[in-house]
Amino acid sequence: MKKKTLSVAAAALAAVMLATGCSQTASSVASSVATSSEIASSVAESTVSAEETSYPLTLQIYDADGNAVDMTYDHAPEKVLSTQLSMTELLIKLGLKDTIVGVFDNDNALKGDIADEIASLNSLGDKKSVSKETILATEPDLILGKGPLMFTESSIGTVQSYQELGIPVYTELASASIDQSLDNIVEDVRNIGEIFNVQETANSYADELQERIDALMDKVSSQSGEPLKVLFMAGYADGTFVAYNSKMSSCMLNALNAENVLDKGGNGLTLENLVSMNPDIIV
């Protein structure tokens, strides 16, 4: 199997991409390109918002199949269920931890200060087994998560089913089954800021992310030659693993002059077909 290496900057963006694809999206990018102390400083300096959200606020989100849905938010949410670690992290970093009424168990053990923050939240259980009834019992006025991963009939229910119950949903743009752009990573942060009426804090944070992403892109723009073949794999605490691909991960790989060796993710990977795919890099 061939061995190739990425530049330091490209490797950094690859790490960002993996986080975005597996358990961390918009705010995971933040975690990869900004330190907790920088975030805390940004939040502290933006305690008074110069912009106010005008409610009702309507944003376009996407369901599990990539269909556009107009979602209306009547007020700043006070009881939020976060089905995705990245969204939970983002709420904490924007000073909104007190709004969280429920989360799901993490796929893997967390490290650092964020681990203690997350551990103090009310976990409803494993995302594979939490019922819609359990979710509704928290009486959420907003549910956050990835559209393709969580908002299906076989998981916690569709976006439309919660909309019919009068419970607004926000699905990450960066996770949607649509043609992706790196802009969606930052746009998710801005949208959360608008939904919660903390625009100044969120926009300051988003601007900081954009600057770091732009700097990384400048460093990797010189990558040339044959695209590197990359295989992304995610391991879990129970010892299982899956290969991974998504619209956003493909978008980021293209920026690195690379491509995923899989058309789609799955858990049926064997040593034999791994060898036959002959990836240049396994992340």
Spell out what each predicted region is.
Residues 16-21:
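C-terminal motif of bacterial Sec signal peptides marking the signal peptidase cleavage site
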Residues 68-77, 114-123, 202, 255-265:
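A local structural motif
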